[in-house]
Amino acid sequence: MPSPQGRVSLVAFNPFDHRGIPIDDQIRNWGQLDVAPIDPDNADPYTKCRIITMNGIEAEAIMFSHHFARVCPDLDTRQLLAKVRYVEQQQQKLVNWLLPGQASVLETTLSYEQVATDLTGWVARMEPDPYLKACYEFGLLEDFDHLYRYANLYEMIEHRKAEKIVDGLTEVMPGRPTYQQHRDPLDNVRQPYDRETAAPLSKLHALTIMAAEQQTMNFYMNMGPLYMEPIARQLYQEIGMVEEEHVTHYESMLDPHETWYERLVNHEYNECYLYYSFMQTESDPRIKGFWELHLNMELEHLRLACDLMRRAEDRDPEAMLPRELPEPVTFEQNKTYIRQLLATQIDYTTLGTGIVQEAHERFEAMQDRINAERPSTEIVIDEHRHKFGEEYRLETEGPHPVPRLREKPYQ
């Protein structure tokens, strides 16, 4: 593998000014893909979060490329998609294989929910569109609750505490209770942004969170049935159904009028943005090197996607995206922000494409039907309290901001 053509500066960066590594030089051999995983005991939790995020981003890039190829009649385009997609698959293999085999499925699950909490928290804080911001805040309180439910399962099954995984960076306590997250599917579809007027950052945010939630959904779909314990199987099933709602929620925020070529450019630009972001914020020098290498690959993918769009649509893709990458996506604590949302938005649900505070007939009908038996997300807390005399929580900033959700003495 040749060295990247010029190291990337950590100042304002224009991805259109860099060619990166030529596509014909990007395929790696097995030895280059066989990377040592991170240390499960000593790695920065946010390093693991960045790995999980980029795995989801690469998985989305791969599946988008496959879907594009299935509807594209142009042979040259399909061949180039295949060429780039093969490299994306190698990138996904390297990134996902950085996760340590010693980590249990539940430990990785806790990290997935830490991603869902702190990545969505950052995006929500940075989102310029008020409606889209509200959509991110809505989903954030739901994934925050999933972290709490899985943390209680983790201590019950593995007799270890989630603070070992989240390292005090993310609190563990109830969010919007998961049993209240089951809505009529009609109420999971949001209004899309307008491709002509939306801020470019809004487009990148939507792609990022959609891909992350999609990866979480797929992970739970595949990992849930591998457990023997009934409560674990049930919990993954219930939360997995909420992830279906979340993918619907986030994917519907993308403008369906974007052309396939436009979407391809957006995907490649977003990959450049995220690899660049994580290269700047990564604490592990070895992992930072992988982010830089993949950035230099993605710069070439972006160039090729732009060339395809110019040829197919006679449009300049650089006119629809910023010349300089936005402020880097950063994994950081969101404790104060989440507590503010808990105090003000805990009872929200959705009606049509809007977010409302009052329950309504369609919501209540869905609740009555799906929660006819006590849901696993409540049972897991019951069983933890019965076994340990208390819930598992990690409340580093004081009591829960919602009085009714504060832990009550076990009787």
Regions found by a protein language model. Give the residues of each.
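Non-heme di-metal
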Residues: 2-411
